[in-house]
Structure formats: C-alpha cells, structure tokens
Amino acid sequence: MAAASGASPQSEYIQHHLVHLNNLGEKQSVIAQFNVINYDSLFWSGLMGLIVIFCLWLAARRATAGVPGRFQGFVEMIVDMVNDQAKGIVQNAKSREFVAPLALTVFLWIILMNALDLLPVDLFPTIWRVTGLGAEHGDPLYYHRILPTADLNVPMGMSLGVLLLMFYYGIKIKHPAGFVKELFTAPFHAHGLAALVLAPFNLLLNLIEYAAKSVSLGMRLFGNMFAGELIFMLIALLGGAWTGFNASSIGLGIGHVLAGSVWAIFHILIVLLQAFIFMMLTLVYIGQAHEGH
C-alpha cells in the first residue's frame, strides 16, 4: 500500500488512523462534505452522552439527605461548581433553570469524549484486525476513529447549538423587534442620519461577532484534541520501530514508554481544561445574549 502510493509506512499509518468510519468507505475528499456521515463519531459521542445521563440519573437516585457517599459527593461537587459559575454569569434565574443543567451536561459530555484519546492508539485497530472486522481494506471497521472531538463535525455542531441558543435568548429577552434593532444600532450608537449611515457597519460587526464566537468555540476544542491525537500517533510510531533486542530498538522503546506516559499525564489536563473552557464560554455567550451592548 505504501509502495503503491509512494508514501512512507509512517505516513500511511497516520493517514489510516485519521480516516473515519463513514458512509463512503474511504477518506472524504474535502473538509466540508455534507453528504458524509461519520458513523464512528455518532456512535462514540452518543455512547458517552448516554454514560453521562446514566451517571447523573444514578447519582440522583442514590441521593440521600444524610452524609453523602463518595460518588454522590463527587457529583454534588461538580454540580455546585457549575451552578456557581452559572449564577455568576447568567443573571436571569428563569434562564438558569435550563442553562445550568445544559452547562453541566456539556462539561461532563466533553470530558468523556476527550478522555477516549487516552486509550492506546492501536487498541481498537488491533481488536478489529484480530476479529477480522478490520484486517484489510474493505472490511467493515478497517477505518475507525474513536475520538469524536477530533472530528470537526462534532465540536462545530456543538458550537452551532450554542449559537442558536444565543439567538433564542437574545430574541426571548429583548423581543424580536429589540433584537433586530440592536443588530443595527450597536456597538456604534447614533441618532438621525448618522444612525442610518452606521447601521450597515453595526450589522456587519454583529454578524462577524456571532460568527467568530461560534467558529472559535468549535475550532478551539477540535484543534487541541486533533493535535493531541496526532501526538499520540507519533509516539506510537516509536514503539512500532522495534526490530529486536538491540541498542536502537531498546532506546526507542524506552522513549516510547516515557514520551507516552508524560504526554498522557499532561493530556489529562488538556482533556479537563478544554471541557471547562467550552462550558464557560457557553455560559458567557448565553449570558451576553441577555445583555444589551
């Protein structure tokens, strides 16, 4: 395969691991290809979402008025943290009844999706190869990625949901006429003829602001997780260079273990930090939708 394409085995390895299990059966040709459905991203994101729902349901079911157990105490700590952040950012108490649980769900969901990156790079490819489900091209699971947040569709889909909520609360709080008026009258306020002259510029700036918020929210999560996944693949190549008990292979093997361990420990911080940032920006953007310029 490598010889046929002219690419090195290392390049072929990385390219293979970056292809999704989709309805095409091959790598999509362009970044934005709307007829492509990535089944692996749908499965793993859905599974992580169900796990979040189950854990929260289990915590609610086991909740007691007395001294909480470890699991209940851990969940209550996270809930209180998210609720405190929501109270400080979204001032409307009625809106917080939905926004706070949403932020909690987003936070936990992204943590679980990101945490899939900590699994060994070749764990599932090896399982598919041994079981015959992904041994060669054409097998059902020959292409398969388990990290949903490294699929641009997932973070951008979530950021699109946040954008729609910004529009929803902006219209709900300010009413349709007030929302549209603000698009044309802010951030540069004026009266009379000056207001008419500035209206197109205000509209353009507001549209750019909404687009920038949405794109940056999704791209930040995608970029960090894609880079982390790629580094794990590069580290895995060190282990794949083993040729026997010789100085070169032993050195690469030790480097593989050390680099993998150090990056995995550091990546735990990235997993949690990116989930927290996405949650906080979700609260900030929705909170801003309640306010006027």
Swiss-Prot record:
InterPro entries: ATP_syn_F0_a_bact/chloroplast, ATP_synth_F0_asu, ATP_synth_F0_asu_AS, F0_ATP_A_sf. This is ATP synthase subunit a. The gene is atpB. Belongs to the ATPase A chain family. It comes from the Bacteria. Its main location: membrane. The lineage of its organism: Bacteria, Pseudomonadati, Pseudomonadota, Betaproteobacteria, Burkholderiales. Key component of the proton channel; it plays a direct role in the translocation of protons across the membrane. The chain crosses the membrane at residues 40-60, 98-118, 151-171, 188-208, 225-245, 264-284. One of its GO terms (biological process) is proton motive force-driven plasma membrane ATP synthesis. GO terms for molecular function: proton-transporting ATP synthase activity, rotational mechanism.
